Amino acid sequence: MKSGRFIGVMSGTSLDGVDVVLATIDEHRVAQLASLSWPIPVSLKQAVLDICQGQQLTLSQFGQLDTQLGRLFADAVNALLKEQNLQARDIVAIGCHGQTVWHEPTGVAPHTLQIGDNNQIVARTGITVVGDFRRRDIALGGQGAPLVPAFHHALLAHPTERRMVLNIGGIANLSLLIPGQPVGGYDTGPGNMLMDAWIWRQAGKPYDKDAEWARAGKVILPLLQNMLSDPYFSQPAPKSTGREYFNYGWLERHLRHFPGVDPRDVQATLAELTAVTISEQVLLSGGCERLMVCGGGGRNPLLMARLAALLPGTEVTTTDAVGISGDDMEALAFAWLAWRTLAGLPGNLPSVTGASQETVLGAIFPANP
């Protein structure tokens, strides 16, 4: 069974940077050793935003974007190796999620698309890459997401305490770690995505630092109720979503009914939308004693305060409190999934994704010996 140093690479729906994590992984433990966040050039970020919102590209433009992202991921890995004074031979493999540009797990031909050419990463780092993690699950009738609950269960499940892990990235997803029950998990809806999109358009800021804008505004209740009427929120699990659905166009359609509103009030309403949709799903799933938050949303003081207020009797904390960096959780999960793939172990949970069976995930892009 492969064990040793693995690198996880994650570029999430928030597009706030490429997260790269170095960890030692074997069948008994996952020990994080180092991490870094690598910036995404504004031009690349905008290109990804455009394609996620349905803007047409030529095949040439699409191919260039795939190559550019692969090179970006390789640069991020090489920066971490240099920082840690490591060579390619010191790493077993890289687990690279890729950049999701479209996720459509239902319909006549279900599919999901993550780009960032893994061949570029192998060529530029000299390290074996495991990528394309989601499509095998979809081929077996699953949603292809979320995949991280299996990792949450391996690291954070408790024999007696009802726990849930909440990742608030661009999309928010919940892992249900309830003793005596199969692991559950699904996307609750928008996490930071709409808040980030709004402040980017209104103020040119990548995100609302410390919720300053949202805290200066007031929740517009009719707008909140209008957004909460979206059918996704009442759809039963398994379910997953992404930027192709909850994007700036979605927000604009709801704002048409509310002309002339204060931008800060919209920011406050979007924060409340995230908090309310998450807390409703926690309660619908039977509640928990401890809700452990990871992802960028864990640094949003307004979101954390609203979750605590909406979930009385639940201890709302971050995964940092139990020794796992909330910022690095997803990248660490894909390093772990790469280890499972190389070990021939399944990486999905049918109780989460709805797939017909457990399966080994991903494709292996081997480095030259």
From Swiss-Prot:
CDD domains linked to this entry: ASKHA_NBD_ANMK
Keyword Kinase appears in the UniProt entry: yes
ATP-binding among keywords: yes
Protein name: Anhydro-N-acetylmuramic acid kinase
Tree of life domain: Bacteria
Organism this protein belongs to: Escherichia coli O1:K1 / APEC
Pathway: Amino-sugar metabolism; 1,6-anhydro-N-acetylmuramate degradation; Cell wall biogenesis; peptidoglycan recycling
Any one Gene Ontology BP term: 1,6-anhydro-N-acetyl-beta-muramic acid catabolic process
Family: Belongs to the anhydro-N-acetylmuramic acid kinase family.
Name of the encoding gene: anmK
Keywords linked to the UniProt accession: ATP-binding, Carbohydrate metabolism, Kinase, Nucleotide-binding, Transferase
